[in-house]
Regions:
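Short, glycine/charged-enriched hinge/interface segments at domain edges or termini
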Residues: 2-4, 9-10, 43, 61-249, ...
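Flexible glycine/proline-rich
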Residues: 27-32, 41, 54, 87, ...
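Short, low-complexity, intrinsically disordered N-terminal peptides in bacterial proteins
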Residues: 1-7, 18, 127-139, 315-324, ...
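Conserved active-site and cofactor/substrate-binding residues in soluble primary-metabolism enzymes
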Residues: 4-11, 26-29, 33, 47, ...
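Short, low-complexity N-terminal leaders and the immediately following helix N-cap/first helix
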Residues: 1-72, 78, 101, 139, ...
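Helix-rich terminal scaffold detector
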Residues: 1-10, 192-332, 336-342
Length: 454
């Protein structure tokens, strides 16, 4: 590659991935505390689900053959000999001409091969006279007999043992994120503990003489720290464990000391915003080089062209312990939108790979969109434009007959500067403008990266 050629997004990302030795080690977590964690092992169901035949409805457990002649105007009568409630094992067998009242979810008693819903029955007294209205709620006094007004097929209104899962079925694969649904499934088969990847420990450092922390006086030339809190939130949303390294002045010794603190604390990655360009106060690259190898890349992306990446070790770590891979170092631009975009492009997928996510879960979901506005970017650099999409009254994106959403510039044409945070806050996606275009007109089709979806 020639010195003046910009790296493509893919080239830069592959260089980052090449430095990742593998995911973090596993640890045991309570399932109840596992939301968002990533499974580190192949997990199978220890039991069938359901674990036994059970009723899908309130009604009566019966022999289907006993109802073969039943009709609405010519019901058949069955003797009620007992009741089974949810959580109660049956202690009576269904015999020919009998029925057992059963609750939804209760085990099917022996001898029964179907359930007749209560809505298709009428309670009777011992003489066969109606003892209540048809379809009466199945929680009152147990009737002596019932009239069944419809024939029932074998297996009717039953959930068969293992119909959801057979014992030994894989339920969680390595790299699966524990969502509420996955946690519910694992709990439903009796699991309480799960092996998950440890969340990557990530140090976050903001830089700049003008940057002020929480509660500090801004004075005549200070600005509140936006990048630090934003990066902390982005790290956590990506599955990492964020650890603030504070705010460093534009001085080599301050930046160096804070990076060293992150390395000594055992961070798997350190992210620094600001100070990675080539100005006289851009000292991050030199501070990085005190601890490892670092390169300043010029990436063909807008916003966010300057980007530093490398690896480092804490003082005293000679690399002899294979269980302690080097720390990843990321130097991001200081402008808030550039920080956000470069994090999305390079840091987020790296952290998710460190955290053990499936390869197909490293990136944001991709869609197709039609631009509602003209867009101008820099030719030769891939543009990532902040947009919001048309939605219906339920908040669902509207789609045309080709399945495409309509994307509007967040903040309008003036809201696309790398310093404009207000437009970023209202965007729910990034529209991708190919390198070969510097202008796309309204109606052009583009790739869309959703930001409000994992």
């Amino acid at each position: 590659m020639t010195a003046d050629r910009l790296l493509t997004v893919e080239e830069a990302r592959e260089r980052v991935f090449a430095a990742i030795a593998g995911p973090t080690e596993s640890e045991v977590a309570w399932l109840s505390e596992g939301l968002g964690r990533v499974a580190a092992e192949h997990i199978t169901s220890p039991i069938a689900l359901p674990p036994w035949d059970n009723s899908a409805m309130d009604g009566y457990a019966i022999r289907a053959a006993d109802t073969a002649a039943a009709a609405d105007d010519a019901p058949v009568q069955l003797e009620v000999i007992g009741e089974v409630r949810a959580g109660q094992p049956p202690d009576v067998e269904v015999r020919r001409g009998t029925a057992i009242r059963i609750a939804t979810g209760a085990p099917i008693p022996p001898g029964a091969d179907a359930v007749v819903p209560v809505e298709q029955t009428t309670p009777l007294d011992v003489s066969g006279n109606a003892a209540g209205p048809r379809g009466r709620d199945a929680t009152g006094p147990l009737p002596a007999r019932i009239a069944v007004h419809a024939s029932v097929e074998p297996g009717g209104s039953m959930r068969r043992m293992g119909s959801d899962l057979a014992a030994g079925t894989a339920i969680i694969e390595p790299g699966t994120q524990l969502t509420p649904a996955v946690i519910g499934l694992a709990a439903g088969v009796g699991l309480e503990l799960v092996n998950v990847h440890r969340r990557p420990h990530v140090g976050v450092l903001a830089t700049g003489d003008e940057v002020r922390g929480r509660g500090a006086e801004l004075g005549a030339a200070g600005i509140p720290d936006a990048n630090g809190p934003a990066l902390m939130a982005m790290v956590e949303a990506a599955g990492g464990y964020p650890d603030t390294l504070g705010i460093a002045a534009d001085r080599f010794d301050d930046v160096r000391a804070r990076i060293c603190a992150g390395l000594v604390a055992g961070a798997e990655a350190i992210i620094v915003s600001g100070g990675v360009s080539v100005g006289p106060y851009d000292v991050v690259r030199d501070a990085f080089r005190e601890f490892g190898e670092i390169e300043l890349w010029r990436v063909a992306v807008q916003p966010g062209k300057p980007f530093a990446f490398g690896t480092a070790r804490a003082p005293g770590d000679d690399g002899s312990d294979p269980s302690r891979p080097p720390t990843l170092l990321f130097g991001l631009p200081g402008n808030p939108v550039s920080t956000f975009v470069t994090f999305e492009l390079f840091v987020r997928p790296a952290l998710r790979r460190l955290g053990g996510f499936h390869d197909d879960a490293l990136y944001r979901p991709i869609d197709r969109a039609v631009l509602a506005d003209d867009v101008t970017t820099s030719s030769g650099r891939r543009g990532f434009v902040r947009v919001f999409v048309d939605r219906d009254e339920r908040g669902t994106p509207r789609r045309d007959d080709r399945g495409r959403v309509t994307a509007h510039l967040a903040g309008g044409a003036s809201g696309q500067g790398s310093h404009v945070m207000s437009a970023l806050a209202t965007a729910d996606a990034l529209a991708v403008i190919p390198e070969e275009h510097d202008t796309l007109v309204s109606g052009a089709e583009v790739e869309l990266w959703w930001l409000d979806r994992a």
